[in-house]
Amino acid sequence: MSTRLDFSKLTLMDALDLASLIEIEARNRYLEFAESLGTRGDGDAGAVFRSMAENETKHCEEIAERRLSLFGDEEARVTLDDIFDVEAPEMGDVRWNISVLKAYQLALYSEQKAFAFYDEALDYVTQPDVKALFQELRDEETQHVNMLVKIIANLPKSAEIELEDEDYDPNRPARDSFEA
């Protein structure tokens, strides 16, 4: 959607499908962050993002279960493109050499947008089970936001440094061709 999401026009199925896409995209992004940043032990950025990805997977499963029980195999009308108004950062924001700080900032931004999605959707969702699920997910987004704010506040200055390509040598002459 190129304009702001109009919640009044969403069906219950659309809301569930958007929620599912939000969680799937977040999981994939957090796995990408974890892979890019690496894991050196409990509590480092890679481990935090792996844990967040696991949490998003659980959210996906809860939403999928609810959707299946209500709508069966009915085809979704929303697509991955529709979530960029809701949670996902711009595609260019996620880079291979992202700094720890930037990764956490993007995660915070995404979690804040996810909170806003669930919070606003609650004004339109009337089905009791889905309303309860969205309230639970909104509350979890609040926890994620609070956690990320604390992590960011305690990051060392070095967290601002972007990753470097260890194979890159600025003193090695460039080659025009790799032919022998």
Q: What does each of the following model-derived ranges do?
A:
Residues 1-180:
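Non-heme di-metal
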